[in-house]
C-alpha cells in the first residue's frame, strides 16, 4: 500500500469521495485498521479518557502522545498519521514548534491543535517550518472548563464566528480541519467554504470525512455514549467486519444518519 497523503485527501474532497478516519493508540489496532483499509488515523488526547481513565483530556502530556504515536506508526507505516498537541502544549508558537517537532520525530505526519483565529500565528509558524497542521473547531475538549461541559457549538451567531475562524486558519496554512459537535447546517457551510478537507465528528454527513474514537465505534466506551457515536461491532460480528462497515457507511453517506446529527 502506498503512503496516504494530504494531497490524496484533497483529491477525495474534489471528487466528493467521503473517507473514514479513526483514533488509534497502539500497534495491534493500528495494524488491524490499516489492513482493513483505514488509511488515516489520529493519536488523540482522547487517550486520557479511553486509555488512562481520566475524566477529561487535560492531564495528557506531550510524551504520552509521542509514546502512542510511535506505537501506531509501527503498526501502520503507510497511514496518514495525525497527533494531537495536548493541553498547554501550544500556548505560544515557539512552544508549539518544539512540541510538534517531538511528534514528527515520533512518526506523525501532521499535528492537530484546538482553537480559533488566535492560533493563526502558530499555524503560520508551523507551516513555514514544514510541520503540517490540522485545525480543530467546534467542541474543542481541551476547552471543556470554558464551555461548561461537552455541548454543541456554533449555533446562531457563533456559527459565523466559527466560519470566520476556519477561513483564517486555512489562510494561515492549515491543511485539514476537524469539526466537532456543530449543527449540520454550519458543517455544510464550512465544508463548502473551505478548499481543504473537513473531517467531522458530530457534524452530520456533509463533511468530506468522518472520525470516531475507536472505543465509540466498537461500543466499548463506559458511561455516557455521545449522540454521534455508532457501535458498528453490534451488527458486524467482529472488529474487522465492523471497520469495513464503518468505512462503507461513511463512503455511502449512511453514517452519520439523522439520529447522529445536531441542528
Curated annotation (Swiss-Prot):
Active site per UniProt: 180 (proton acceptor)
GO cellular component: cytoplasm
Superkingdom classification of source: Bacteria
One term of GO molecular function: magnesium ion binding
CDD domains: KPHMT-like
Pathway: Cofactor biosynthesis; (R)-pantothenate biosynthesis; (R)-pantoate from 3-methyl-2-oxobutanoate: step 1/2
Sorted UniProt keywords: Cytoplasm, Magnesium, Metal-binding, Pantothenate biosynthesis, Transferase
InterPro entries: Pantoate_hydroxy_MeTrfase, Pyrv/PenolPyrv_kinase-like_dom, Pyrv_kinase-like_dom_sf
Needed cofactors: Mg(2+)
Function: Catalyzes the reversible reaction in which hydroxymethyl group from 5,10-methylenetetrahydrofolate is transferred onto alpha-ketoisovalerate to form ketopantoate.
Family per similarity comment: Belongs to the PanB family.
Subunit comment: Homodecamer; pentamer of dimers.
Protein name: 3-methyl-2-oxobutanoate hydroxymethyltransferase
Gene from which the chain derives: panB
Amino acid at each position: 500500500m502506498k503512503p496516504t497523503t494530504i494531497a490524496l485527501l484533497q483529491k477525495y474532497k474534489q471528487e466528493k469521495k467521503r473517507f473514514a478516519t479513526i483514533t488509534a493508540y497502539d500497534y495491534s489496532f493500528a495494524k488491524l485498521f490499516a489492513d482493513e483499509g483505514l488509511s488515516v488515523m489520529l493519536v488523540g488526547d482522547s487517550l486520557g479518557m479511553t486509555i488512562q481513565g481520566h475524566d477529561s483530556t487535560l492531564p495528557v502530556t506531550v510524551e504520552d502522545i509521542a509514546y502512542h504515536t510511535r506505537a501506531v506508526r509501527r503498526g501502520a507505516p503507510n497511514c496518514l498519521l495525525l497527533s494531537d498537541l495536548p493541553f498547554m502544549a501550544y500556548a505560544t508558537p515557539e512552544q508549539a514548534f518544539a512540541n510538534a517537532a517531538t511528534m514528527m520525530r515520533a512518526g506523525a505526519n501532521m499535528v492537530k491543535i484546538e482553537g480559533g483565529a488566535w492560533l493563526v500565528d502558530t499555524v503560520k509558524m508551523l507551516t513555514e517550518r514544514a510541520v503540517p497542521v490540522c485545525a480543530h473547531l467546534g467542541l474543542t475538549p481541551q476547552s471543556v472548563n470554558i464551555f461548561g461541559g461537552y455541548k454543541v457549538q456554533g449555533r446562531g451567531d457563533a456559527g459565523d464566528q466559527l466560519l470566520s475562524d476556519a477561513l483564517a486558519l486555512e489562510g494561515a496554512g492549515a491543511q485539514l480541519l476537524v469539526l466537532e459537535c456543530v449543527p449540520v447546517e454550519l458543517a455544510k457551510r464550512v465544508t463548502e467554504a473551505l478548499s481543504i478537507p473537513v473531517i467531522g465528528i458530530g457534524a452530520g454527513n456533509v463533511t468530506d470525512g468522518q472520525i470516531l474514537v475507536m472505543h465509540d465505534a466498537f461500543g466499548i466506551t463506559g458511561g455516557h455514549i455521545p449522540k454521534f457515536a455508532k457501535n458498528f461491532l453490534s451488527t458486524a460480528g467482529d472488529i474487522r467486519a465492523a471497520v469495513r462497515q464503518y468505512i462503507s457507511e461513511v463512503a455511502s453517506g449512511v453514517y452519520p444518519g439523522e439520529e447522529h446529527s445536531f441542528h
